[in-house]
Amino acid sequence: MGCSSSSTKTRRSDTSLRAALIIQNWYRGYKARLKARQHYALTIFQSIEYADEQGQMQLSTFFSFMLENYTHIHKEELELRNQSLESEQDMRDRWDYVDSIDVPDSYNGPRLQFPLTCTDIDLLLEAFKEQQILHAHYVLEVLFETKKVLKQMPNFTHIQTSPSKEVTICGDLHGKLDDLFLIFYKNGLPSERNPYVFNGDFVDRGKNSIEILMILCVSFLVYPNDLHLNRGNHEDFMMNLRYGFTKEILHKYKLHGKRILQILEEFYAWLPIGTIVDNEILVIHGGISETTDLNLLHRVERNKMKSVLIPPTETNRDHDTDSKHNKVGVTFNAHGRIKTNGSPTEHLTEHEWEQIIDILWSDPRGKNGCFPNTCRGGGCYFGPDVTSKILNKYQLKMLIRSHECKPEGYEICHDGKVVTIFSASNYYEEGSNRGAYIKLCSGTTPRFFQYQVTKATCFQPLRQRVDTMENSAIKILRERVISRKSDLTRAFQLQDHRKSGKLSVSQWAFCMENILGLNLPWRSLSSNLVNIDQNGNVEYMSSFQNIRIEKPVQEAHSTLVETLYRYRSDLEIIFNAIDTDHSGLISVEEFRAMWKLFSSHYNVHIDDSQVNKLANIMDLNKDGSIDFNEFLKAFYVVHRYEDLMKPDVTNLG
């Protein structure tokens, strides 16, 4: 009997162990599938983000093209607003920007006292936690005072650490004020004993960019030797037009917003472009290339880099009498080439410009070599060999950079020689990623600190968080798909030799990759985007189900509507450049002239009669003017309500 009892217990124990192993294996598989879905969603967000940045960089070639061809398209003297070509001599003095703006007694927000002290930092933090707005007078004064100090600084700040004085490196914040509050809560406020480096991209995307900028600038003015600011690719007035900071300023400072934007352009240009810690760690926003020349970058006149979208122009030194001037000091000669009013020394050389672009825009890759950053459209991809070459050349040990969202807030690559740090948590969607910062001390290994701003969604189970993130990613991907409906339909039909309305998943994926230019796992995504029949074939017109572009003018041709929707961000920037008085209005003739240039440069094939008809319809009161910004807002995507509300039964894994 004793043996029988022992045998039974053994069998039960074996059964329990097998059951535990089955559950464990199932759970591991479940977690792996969730992680795969999360990875696919992040890939969608990142691919679309980089494609938008590529479009933004392509605007630089358009602006050059526009200036070179402007007189050929439109013989009358149209006025262009080009902030980057205004000289500082044309800027009004401090009185016009700061002292002429009174702070009324009725203002209940924070009142700063210059010269600033740590009390002002505390005052500002408490006010912003209460969602108060800093008066425009103080915003302008802070920017003026910060610019004054920045102008005295070198291109690269050199700092030293010690066992009793670590330095904290923060990456992109992108207007995420709660992340900055959390960093200061966990790590302490900036001080002589607690120095910080903020590695660019303070602004854009998030809704509190001006608050972050004011906290950083005030802290910098109080501790100029202990808080260090590096320029990122979003510290650029042209980037701000697309990614939200310009709109934030104009919304919060309706009366004085334009003045703030003008000063910001100069402020950005004077930001240092890098920091070197203990003579061995290079801290820059983007990365390097095989031709990165730190000696040149130490010497370059950084304030000449107003915007990455305004590349160096061809300076014609001949005194051509047959020339045409516009409002901003640009001269077109008889051949349509650009001349600038002033000496060539007022502008960066092309080589200098490319050097700065590389350190602001480049990304590391695992593959050796250096090749164009085709995803972003600017900078390059650099491999481990390039990292070793540049670090060895300048006797450095490590490169710390930001510029890329990472799921854990940081990433180490290139045999530990390159570290990416990203400080904006929940960047794409609630729960999408952690933020992180680094603490450095001479002779020790970098220490990483992770965090995540917690809101209601962050307390949800992982499955629900992944569902939310996945649904959001698929939604923006569908919006990209519908903007190319005509092109995709033609591509599908070319593959559909039997005219069946169906393609193999491989054929469908080939069309999506080819037309949209997004490097995504289309086969894996197919179950979320299209209907697949029992034989595994894609009903390709279902790519456009449950979504449409709402068009404000019903008479407009669908191809024109798709084109306007697809390029709406680019067009908004271009037409804001024409709107010299910020009225929001442009003339019908300006619209037609600039559309010709735009369609020619972007190879957009739209019949002129459609554009002329649309221009006339847009001129609602027939006064010859178009409220173009309002018109563009009218083009938006409508998702079918039921589709957004029903629970998601498919997944990306």
Swiss-Prot record:
One of its GO terms (biological process) is protein dephosphorylation. Its EC number is 3.1.3.16. The keyword Manganese applies. It holds the Pfam family IQ. Ca(2+) 1 binds at residues 579, 581, 583, 590. InterPro entries: Calcineurin-like_PHP_ApaH, EF-hand-dom_pair, EF_Hand_1_Ca_BS, EF_hand_dom, IQ_motif_EF-hand-BS, Metallo-depent_PP-like, PPP_dom, PPP_phosphatase. Mn(2+) 2 binds at residues 201, 233, 285, 403. Keywords: Calcium, Hydrolase, Magnesium, Manganese, Metal-binding, Protein phosphatase, Repeat. The keyword Magnesium applies. It comes from the Eukaryota. The active site is at 234 (proton donor). It is an enzyme of class 3 (hydrolase). GO terms for molecular function: calcium ion binding; iron ion binding; manganese ion binding; protein serine/threonine phosphatase activity. Residues 483-518, 566-601, 606-641 form the EF-hand domain. Its cofactor is Mn(2+); Mg(2+). GO terms for cellular component: cytosol; nucleus. Ca(2+) 2 binds at residues 619, 621, 623, 625, 630. Activated by calcium. Residues 16-45 form the IQ domain. Mn(2+) 1 binds at residues 172, 174, 201. Also found in fetal brain. Belongs to the PPP phosphatase family. PANTHER family: SERINE/THREONINE-PROTEIN PHOSPHATASE 5-RELATED, SERINE_THREONINE-PROTEIN PHOSPHATASE WITH EF-HANDS 1. This is Serine/threonine-protein phosphatase with EF-hands 1.
